[in-house]
Amino acid sequence: MKKVMAAALGLTLGTISTAWAQRADRNVDQPIVRSLNWFSYVAAEDIRAACRPGGRSRLRLIYNALWEEQVRAYELFLQPDGTAGLNIGVLADQAPATIVSSITIGELGDITGPWRMRRGQRLLTAAQVGDLMGSLQASAAFGPPRDGLRLPDNDFWWTVASCRDGVWGFQAYHYPTDRFANVKFAEKLFSFDNVAIAVNRPRNLEPAELRRDPNLRPGRERADRWMLVVGKDGLRAR
């Protein structure tokens, strides 16, 4: 029985979509894999490690619209002819983080539903790519970021990781800080998003540290909260 369960687990964790414009280097689709890789995925450690002259140019943009409500991930693969492949992944209506830590092998049948990314794909023309890259440039999206900026899981924020012509870049934007005043690219990117889940727009909320999850028992309201901290050229190690 243990061998069967182990094989089932391996099959579940090994499922990787091959329908994207170009295959991403990390699989963050399945919930257990995402719980292990999510922070390094947002930090784009894979992109940074492979960023060198002569390599492929690509960007990863993460829109965290309150972790438990919605997250949208955009992978942009720039092509030599000026076009680009855009892969879109959306997580919506996620359960509290405590559920991830409580998953057991016997619950394999339950982990592939609401936790799976809904996916979309677009091929952008050279003109569309030019407009998008221009809006990113106007947003200072290629860095440097504000050192020490905090990104709580239950806030609205963006991160942009990039490798362009072998040059690494990183930027982050936190909605409560400046109401996304410097984010010039969001509407352009959302216009390319063909996943049939409405974008969770930023809204004014009380400070993240004061908010509680009513579904958690008393004393556990903040136990599963997490926060990312921006460094001089990327996310600080957790």
Which ranges hold each PLM region?
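Bacterial N-terminal signal peptides
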Residues: 6-15
